Amino acid sequence: MIEDEVPDTDDPAAPAPAPWKVLIVDDDVDVHVVTKFSLSNAVFMGRRLSFLHAYSGEEALQMLRQHDDIALVLLDVIMETTDAGLRVATRIRDELHNALVRIVLRTGQPGQALEHGIILDYDINDFWCKTDLTTRKLFTTVIASLRGYHSLSEAQRLVAAVQTQLAALQQPLQAAVEAVRAGTDWSGTVALGEPAVRMTLAARPAAGHGSPPVTV
């Protein structure tokens, strides 16, 4: 496994934005070299690309465990076995439970499997024959994948923020409910004289301008 250094920015005084992490998985060293060279100048949303390298399925999974912010995996289908890439794609989703990372399968032997069936049966985002994946098409595929990753990441972040806000709102609400329950008699009538209820009512905002809090 190899991790390339993040490229420097033109302005050394400015903080460099975090690069997009792209994991190249292939047992052919030349594929790593050519892929990195083809994308060396790629920039998306002001961020460069940082390349991670794995040469087998197990190395790829280990790298993904170490880096939970990998945005894209360029994954060879045939490595230590004829379906190594397909197995890795499945384990990324089912074992690592990583639904964010974009997976682009690449194969040098298109006759080994039907593209249509792979797209339907595996949770991947694109499938290419290496001979068809020109520099221009590779760039387009990578940028589209990064855009998808960014959109999913933002959606996940917003959901987490909403859940945090709901949890914060639920605490005082639960306290009020417990206070009301503590001040309810056997018939279900709120006993306003109970200390817990008096405290809850006193803590409420005033009903009008200048009105004092309600006390019992």
Segments from the language model and where they lie:
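Non-catalytic signal-transmission and effector/linker regions of two-component phosphorelay proteins
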Residues: M1-L23, V29-S50, R157-T164, Q171-Q174, ...
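His-Asp phosphorelay/catalytic-motif detector in bacterial-type signaling
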Residues: P19, D68-L72, L96-I103
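Active-site residues of response regulator receiver
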Residues: D26, L74-I78
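Short amphipathic alpha-helix used as the core "switch/output" element in two-component signaling
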Residues: N41, E58-R65, I78, A84-A99, ...
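Conserved Asp/Asn-Gly motif in the active-site loop of CheY-like receiver
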Residues: F51-E59
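Hydrophobic/aromatic residues positioned on beta-strands within the core alpha/beta folds
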Residues: V104-T107, K130
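C-terminal output helix
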Residues: A113, T131-V142
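Receiver (REC) domain switch/output surface
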Residues: D121, K137-H150
